[in-house]
Amino acid sequence: MSINSKFTINDVLLNIESLQKKNKYSCPICFEFIYKKSIFQCKSGHFACKECWEKSLKIKKECMICRSKVNSINDLSRCLVIEQGFGKKECYCIYSFNNDHFIDYANLDENITLVKDKENGCKEIINIDQLDRHIQNCKFKFVECSHNGCDVVLRLNSLKEHENQCGYKLVKCKYCACDDTIQKELENHNNECPKFPIGCPQSCSIMVERDQTQSHINNDCNNSTIQCKYYEYGCKVEMKRSELQNHLNNVNHQYFMGILIDKLSSKLIQSHNIQDELVKKIEQSEKNQEILNKEYDQSKVICENRSKIICDKHVKKIEQLEKTQENLNKQFELSRIIGENRSKIICDKLVKTIEKSEKNQENLYKEYERSKIICDKLVKKIEQLEKTQENLNKQFELSRIICDKLQKQNDQLLSLNALKYKNEWIISDYSKIVKKNPKGSLLNSPSFQVNQNNFLKSQSLCNILQNIFHLSFYQNGLSRINKIAIFLMGKSIEGTNVEFICKLVNVLDETNSIKFKTQKLKDIDDLEWDWSWGRSYIIDSNLITQENGWLTKDDKLTIEFKVKIFNNVNKPLES
């Protein structure tokens, strides 16, 4: 019987030869030891393992030794004395051998000889009934190293020591704190580690981190060659950084300091002038903003008044419909009263006729039939009037729904009459244009038109309003303050409001693109163009570079834009 896929009970039993000679603990049929077998016996005491009994009983219903009758396994009794006696026999642990039997058994030579590992193997002698529990907890069992990449197989009691020294153990660099380096590659890592301390390449005897070497040379190293701090102002001496203080102490730099002071004073004056100009422009912008706010408020009031006029008209129509319905109700009530009075008069006449002419029953009957016909007609007329009233109620409800729809249509008039134009302006060779005009320049896009056609079904007339536009791009803004400005310039746009949506495209990251929207009219002093829409301060002009994503590899700047024209003037239809 196998202990596991590598060992049988025969491999570990003590005194196996003695047990084999006695045959007391072997099945007399299959001749195997009764390890992990259920033993059954007949009434005469002849025993065998359960597997052999089942095979034999399929052929003959009798004991294999004494031939006594046995119908099934249920006629047999369990032989616990033999099972328990074998469980008390002693054996070795399977981990008392070396690990040759613990390699991949698919490639194992079946004839390999078991070798005792006297130095490192398990030395315990165990009862057979305790073998499974011991194997599970044995400290001498073979295990694999837990570190990724290490194929070492060793005993459990030496695993901890091995894993601490294993070359595949992940270690943390004490310089850069990275923790994904294995122990045997730590030296190679130190040769590349950006935080590993190395000597200055200019031999200044200072240890610096590898990635800070250039910064040390540029800013701190005493052996670096530097220029005099007044180099730009006339002192053209170069020296080591350690000699700078002696140079400043020994050489008179008052003349060069005077030049520096003059330049700083000049820049300070220019800065004050620029500041004054900016203040003026800000004040002018605030005034322009107030004007735009007033124009917006006026436009808002006009729109509200128009909506109110339309609503008032619909309210009057509804009131007229209600009056019409009220008149119809009165007419219906009057008709009903007239019908009742006529019926009463006819009935009275019939009664009198009956009282006066009891003898002439046939004539009375005819008169009665006539009055019945008249009543039927009156009933039909009443039913028609009721249907008329129901139709009027439906018309009233329909009028209310139409009024609501007209209100919604009025709210959508601006968007329905709007003209839309979408395009993009690509400025090629942007960097070259900037170099040619370092102080800033104005770039104008090609002109474009936004057309509107109003077709009237009752007339073969087409009114075309041509709106001419172009985009103006100011490299340094309107006031040369190193801020990009973009405006839409409009012509022939009398009686319209314009919405201008512009996006400065970032080709590296779309989320960094700058988008703005204007819908306010702005009067400008240009005699050629009537109106303009845009923004003065979009982005610093010096940020428009390929590295920042605003320019493509072939030096192009892309501006996407949309133009909407809302026509607020609706002329009445005439036919």
Curated annotation (Swiss-Prot):
Q: Which GO terms describe its cellular component?
A: cytoplasm
Q: Which Pfam families match?
A: Sina_RING, zf-TRAF
Name the keywords, alphabetized: Coiled coil, Cytoplasm, Metal-binding, Repeat, Zinc, Zinc-finger
Which ranges form a coiled coil?
Answer: 275-401
* Zinc finger intervals, RING-type: 27-67
Q: Where are the zinc fingers (TRAF-type)?
A: 133-186, 188-245
* Gene Ontology MF term list: zinc ion binding
SUPFAM superfamilies named among the record's database cross-references: RING/U-box (SSF57850), TRAF domain-like (SSF49599)
InterPro entries xrefs: Sina-like_RING, TRAF-like, Znf_RING/FYVE/PHD, Znf_TRAF
What is this protein's function per UniProt? Answer: Probable adapter protein and signal transducer that links members of the tumor necrosis factor receptor family to different signaling pathways by association with the receptor cytoplasmic domain and kinases.
User: What's written under domain?
Assistant: The MATH/TRAF domain binds to receptor cytoplasmic domains.
Give the family per the record.
Belongs to the TNF receptor-associated factor family. A subfamily.
What name has this protein been given in UniProt?
A: TNF receptor-associated factor family protein DDB_G0290965
The scientific name of the source species is Dictyostelium discoideum
Cite the source lineage: Eukaryota, Amoebozoa, Evosea, Eumycetozoa, Dictyostelia
